[in-house]
Amino acid sequence: EIPKGWNVLKLGEHCSFNKRTSNGYFNHPILYLDTSNITNNTIDELQFLNPSSDIIPSRARRLVQEGDIVYSTVRPNLKHFGIIMNPDYNMVVSTGFAVITANWSAYRYFIYQFLIQAATIENLSTIAQSAVSAYPSINTSDIENLDLVVPPDSMIEKYAKTACRLYLQIDTNYKEIKSLTKQRDELLPLLMNGQVSVNSDLSVYKKR
């Protein structure tokens, strides 16, 4: 039994899918996210691709904006999903993702938490196993038709304020870690071969 004031609705009533899609032709470099490059909201790599010198994958079509949820439609149990915070203007993701945009921005975090809970992943994985395809997969209608237990708007708003701060901090921490890792990888070989010492002024390297 659900609490008083709560409702059970289909997830698709609160969001739209794949709102922004490119024709695949770009006149500027892009940052491409493939399904294998994000796991449980952690991006391993964004591929920098320049159409003047690189082959742009045919699946590089989905455009994303702040707060969009990307959810791989292949093998949901592998957890290739995340919520996009502070995306670059030229970020493009694979058509292997369902890109989910909440109709009301406050819902994005609530919907994301619902989609990544164990019961939902298990449910979608079961659906994927029965798919008539070469590999376990789902489609957007499978996500749209999920039953979502929704609290009152006032509770959603309160939750969203806290969740937004947390996800922004997670994004900031991730970018700082990537920057520090890059600096380490650049400086360690120089330290090992004697080009710099632990007492050197490393500020020039930090600015790279």
Question: For the regions a protein language model found, what residue spans apply to each?
Answer:
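A short beta-sheet element
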Residues: 60-62, 66-121, 127-140
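Feature representing long, continuous alpha-helical segments
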Residues: 79, 109, 113, 122, ...
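Amphipathic heptad-repeat alpha-helical coiled-coil/stalk segments that mediate oligomerization
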Residues: 197-208
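Non-catalytic DNA-recognition/assembly elements of restriction-modification systems
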Residues: 1-22, 149, 153-157, 164-199
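Proline-centric
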Residues: 2-3, 98-108, 136, 140-169
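Sequence-specific dsDNA recognition surfaces
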Residues: 12-24, 33-68, 78, 93
